[in-house]
């Protein structure tokens, strides 16, 4: 199911992203509002046309992606067992079930969250709570524009709290990805609980630490930061 659904969602997101680029315009690495400085026709002085600049930029990214993609497809299709599990090369045996079934590599962090919730709470079963936590771990990214209360957009000018929490989030994500790809044990399950908490702490505490931290001043023009 997800093999079909995920590409469709990616295509839909790309479509809406292109619509937003034509309507609002693209951002810049410094998060500077280019609409503050315009010419007599109302065109931002620091803006550039979508074509050919953004198109050329996207073609470069596409070339890098295709290089990695083709390398994996033709020379490393199993991806160390993360892309295609080695058990898929074994003859099927209806009388035997694998002791550990690993989900697709991009689901392993959320699978670790699902397994970490092994206790009931407020009359809700552990299975239901695990599903809620797993779904929330994916959906919470959509709430970032409302959670981030920082006056600046670029991590380059944000305070130390944002950088520390971001580092903790990245570490938590990769640790959960590892824990979701290996058989569960009591120790690993406890680690999954800890890093699931740190994962959500990045988002749930964001309205507070982004509001109180001290940020660096943002330049008025894009070229001022060079």
Predicted segments, located by residue:
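Membrane-embedded and interfacial regions of multi-pass energy-transducing membrane proteins
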Residues: 1-226
